[in-house]
Amino acid sequence: MTEKIHKTQLGDIHYWTNIIDENAVTLVFLPGLTADHRLFEKQIEYFENKFNLFVWDAPAHNSSWPFKFDFDLMDKAKWLDEILEKEEIKLPVIIGQSMGGYVAQTY
């Protein structure tokens, strides 16, 4: 997995990708509130040579801290969209845990 940064006006969002086939689906893992990318360590370990992968530290979580607390769920979905567009992830399969599930539904 390669760590990358998406810059916003409120702070930086850290995320990790492993793209092995640009034409295949990408498993997009979104941790819940108070969790970070490490929540999905076992899943990433299992899938990393089988699928394209994406995971982030949501705004104001772990590596994505400091981050100004002036955002809502729609902002998170917008930033996720910007990142997926930038990474040219066209076939996301979104797996969200707790608050990550809300972001997935909003996306």
Question: Where are each of the predicted segments found?
Answer:
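Short, well-ordered coil/turn elements that cap or connect secondary structure elements
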Residues: 10, 48-50, 89
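Conserved phosphate-coordination/catalytic loops
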Residues: 9, 34, 74
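Active-site loop/oxyanion-hole signature of alpha/beta-hydrolase fold enzymes
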Residues: 54-95
